[in-house]
Swiss-Prot record:
Keywords: Calcium, Cell adhesion impairing toxin, Disulfide bond, Hemostasis impairing toxin, Hydrolase, Metal-binding, Metalloprotease, Platelet aggregation inhibiting toxin, Protease, Secreted, Signal, Toxin, Zinc, Zymogen. It is found in: Secreted. Its EC number is 3.4.24.-. Disulfide bonds join C308-C387, C349-C371, C351-C354, C414-C429, C416-C424, C423-C446, C437-C443, C442-C467, C455-C474. It comes from the Eukaryota. This is Zinc metalloproteinase/disintegrin. Ca(2+) binds at E200, D284, C387, N390. Residues 1-20 form the signal peptide.
Amino acid sequence: MIQVLLVTICLAVFPYQGSSIILESGNVDDYEVVYPQKVTALPKGAVQPKYEDAMQYEFKVNGEPVVLHLEKNKGLFSEDYSETHYSPDGREITTYPSVEDHCYHHGRVHNDADSTASISACDGLKGHFKLQGEMYLIEPLELSDSEAHAVFKYENVEKEDEAPKMCGVTQNWESDESIKKASQLYLTPEQQRFPQRHIELAIVVDHGMYTKYSSNFKKIRKRVHQMVSNINEMCRPLNIAITLSLLDVWSEKDLITVQADAPTTAGLFGDWRERVLLKKKNHDHAQLLTDINFTGDTIGWAYVGGMCNAKYSVGTVKDHSSNVFVVAVTMTHEIGHNLGMEHDDKDKCKCEACIMAPVISDKQSKLFSDCSKDYYQTFLTNKKPQCILNAPLRTDTVSTPISGNEFLEAGEECDCGSPSNPCCDVGTCKLSPGAQCADGLCCDQCRFKKKGKICRRARGDNPDDRCTGQSADCPRNGLYG
């Protein structure tokens, strides 16, 4: 009886000590079980939101204490973020979910100046953090003990197959269409190397990927949100803010012919974006996530220097790994191409595993090489891409007028859903006589606020956002006049 009991205990303990386990991120060779403890920053009696703006977690890795400082990524979703899927008869079903209180955070490790972190706190902690130069991943263990998490190095995730995975871009591309010259904007001295830029991102999921995840829209949404959170964090060193503007899931059938030849699929997707997607909602760059096996070892493709072009500001990426972070690196890689970046030359760039490496490395990096930064600076200087100058505004939605949907539609000067708004004529959806505006952070009593009036306090090193005196919208980063 005692022997049987001992065997039972060993079997129960083994998952906590094991050297191999199958996780969402793949089959992991070596991992450590940790129990993150949340350090509450809210005062006693305060009402706690579902996901706090700032959080701190403590746990141990290799016996050493690790303290994660996390902040909510407040710019991750546009104010009019939308999700679209399709009915069996082909009708579009578009919703505008509230995503203000989301669970996606970025941050750093205490007392590690070079550390970074990108963590989803939706159901436990899932994401990655850089600690003492090493990339670690963390995710909850599906055990009865709900506090248990697995922490493991990226290099300990087994490859799903032995074939090298690479980007299919082999040559440069230059648009025949000139990109509109940027207007002069105020830039602080600190922003001169990499001025603040904003990319409104549209993600389209093909039917193959939708069925891959059991035709479960919630699974797709969660995975895409995690990807975009990672992309945003990787683009931050370039002073680029990534904002998810829309998610379009081809739930019934593909709306283009998704082909094994990645450049062909990208071309068809670019045509569809120009013809259909941009007419529904303005955005700067679109990516097609697919489950198709591209020819050869290709997992992604994008036009070099295509950003802000209606047809060429696109990329196509295979959902090639169960590990969200790995796919997010590929998506960031294709955005890099659109921003003028070529592949890293291993002899010149001295970065074996940076984001723009042509082949995925066992030592996955989330950094852009100096070569990539130079390419990006050249692209900004020579092409002056206008579409990424400003943060997303409410008026980026384009659709037929529908009163009272809380968005400014084509043909409307104001949203006329509320008869209590004195600035908007409920019968015509036009501004009331004498009114300049009906709502917005720079609208006060139907008039534009004065130029220079603070409309959004600064976060981090950016300046306060101030009204222009010419609009009800609050521009990002004090870029006015």
